[in-house]
């Protein structure tokens, strides 16, 4: 397992595409959190700065950043299958569970470093400088952000491992996010609510929509349950489907 994780890190870092884009996205996230921090520091009010930062960050392009990460992961995973690299892993004695888990661990670490770490640092800086403003459990938004990002990353990664085609996986990932976002904007769910229960369920369980509500609903028990529940159900279901699809291809 450790060898597979190290090999996955090495492969991704050796990629001529992944590392430059990873560096650019890291810089973009740091820049975005800096702008959000600067805007929140201009807010007048007793402790409102932390809430302003949280609300601005959750609406300030994190959703788009998550989708970019998804497309890159789809392309990276698809390339591994097009190069038939997974057969070498099997020949080296790796089993299906270890192959899937190693990729989940590596790419979730990348996503957390790109998205969550800069947000956590800036969030902490605002809290230290201006106080928490009476926000209960100030650590909770960062924990929820971590779960949401892991949900989005795992969803794209496991779908890509099932599809095994770089372009198709990236297109499906992009279309899913765009359709959900466009439907959400059409229904204007934050203001008017959603009358269609199925559409409302899609919004509540989609990480791309959950992240836009982070700055406002992080204290809601229903929101917390949806974030945690959708993560567990999505990863469990897609992990099972990924394992079955690999076993059918005579994997161990």
Residue ranges and their predicted role:
Residues 232-252:
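Junction motif at the cytosolic side of a transmembrane helix
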Residues 75-109:
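Helix-loop-helix units of permease transmembrane domains in multi-pass membrane transporters
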Residues 191-215:
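Short hydrophobic, aromatic-rich alpha-helical segments embedded in or entering the lipid bilayer
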Residues 11, 78, 89-91, 156, ...:
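Helix-capping/transition residues at the boundaries of transmembrane alpha-helices
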Residues 1-25, 251:
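Aromatic- and glycine-rich beta-strand/loop motifs that create alpha-glucan
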Residues 15-16, 94-95, 164-166:
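Short loop-to-helix capping motifs
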Residues 18-21, 89, 99, 168-170:
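Alpha-helical transmembrane segments and their helix-entry boundary regions
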């Amino acid at each position: 397992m450790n060898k597979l994780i190290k090999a996955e890190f090495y492969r991704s870092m050796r990629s001529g595409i992944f590392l430059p884009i990873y560096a650019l996205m890291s810089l973009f996230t740091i820049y975005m959190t800096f702008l959000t921090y600067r805007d929140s520091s201009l807010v007048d009010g007793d402790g409102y700065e932390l809430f302003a930062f949280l609300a601005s960050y959750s609406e300030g392009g994190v959703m788009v950043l998550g989708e970019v990460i998804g497309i890159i992961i789809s392309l990276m995973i698809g390339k591994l299958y097009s190069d038939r690299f997974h057969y070498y892993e099997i020949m080296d004695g790796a089993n299906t569970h270890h192959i899937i888990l190693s990729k989940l661990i590596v790419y979730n670490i990348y996503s957390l470093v790109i998205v969550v770490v800069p947000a956590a640092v800036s969030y902490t800086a605002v809290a230290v400088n201006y106080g928490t403003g009476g926000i209960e459990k100030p650590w909770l938004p960062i924990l929820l952000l971590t779960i949401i990002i892991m949900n989005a990353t795992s969803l794209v990664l496991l779908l890509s491992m099932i599809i095994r085609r770089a372009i198709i996986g990236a297109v499906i990932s992009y279309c899913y996010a765009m359709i959900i976002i466009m439907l959400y904007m059409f229904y204007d769910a934050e203001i008017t609510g959603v009358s269609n229960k199925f559409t409302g369920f899609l919004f509540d369980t989609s990480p791309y929509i959950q992240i836009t509500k982070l700055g406002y609903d992080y204290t809601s028990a229903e929101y917390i349950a949806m974030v945690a529940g959708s993560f567990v159900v999505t990863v469990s279901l897609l992990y099972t489907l990924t394992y079955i699809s690999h076993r059918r291809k005579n994997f161990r």
